[in-house]
């Protein structure tokens, strides 16, 4: 079994879609754990605020199979691919990490660059895997969050536990 981390986000019917995503992830994978949920402004476009969190899972799927399964879940909840990258989303499920694997292919990058670029990914990841180390930099995610320097990316914790409501 491999430990993987998935970034989860939505800015369309956020609560409903995040809950649905968590239900689908709990049905598909074992040892599902979730970070706190954060609200953040959209990045790269003008749009409604997002809810974001990171989910840890254990899986026997390969990274490619896992990415394909995440795309299936997104499609089940109205996500269409092939359009502009920065747009409002019903559901966004991104494979962030897969064990300590490093993959750099056209349509699959592990670790996902978002881990080092966006507060809405790094902060919740540091909650779940703070002592784990980035497979390229070797720094712990807690240390990376402590050193994160982008003051423009504001996050607000959402005051409820979505995982318990997803069961």
Give the ranges of each region predicted by the language model.
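Extreme N-terminal starter segment of soluble prokaryotic enzymes
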Residues: 1-5
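Short beta-strand-to-loop capping motifs
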Residues: 8-10, 55-61, 97-100
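Short N-terminal binding/cap micro-motifs at the start of the first secondary-structure element
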Residues: 13-16
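Short, surface-exposed acidic-centric catalytic microdomains
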Residues: 20-66
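Flexible, gly/pro- and Lys/Arg-enriched active-site loops
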Residues: 44-50, 64-67, 72-167
């Amino acid at each position: 079994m491999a430990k993987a981390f998935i970034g989860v986000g939505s800015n369309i019917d956020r609560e409903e879609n995040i809950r649905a995503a968590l239900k689908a992830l709990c049905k598909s994978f074992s040892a599902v754990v979730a970070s706190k949920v954060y609200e953040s402004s959209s990045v790269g476009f003008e749009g409604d605020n997002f809810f974001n969190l990171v989910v840890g899972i254990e899986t026997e799927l390969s990274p490619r199979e896992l990415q394909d399964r995440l795309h299936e879940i997104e499609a089940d909840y109205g996500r269409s691919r092939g359009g502009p990258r920065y747009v409002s989303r019903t559901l966004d499920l991104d494979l962030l990490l897969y064990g300590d694997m490093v993959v750099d292919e056209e349509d699959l990058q592990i670790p996902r660059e978002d881990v080092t670029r966006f507060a809405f990914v790094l902060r919740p990841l540091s909650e779940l895997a703070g002592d784990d180390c980035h497979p390229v930099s070797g720094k712990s995610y807690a240390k990376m969050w402590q050193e994160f320097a982008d003051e423009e990316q504001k996050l607000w914790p959402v005051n409820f536990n979505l995982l318990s409501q997803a069961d």
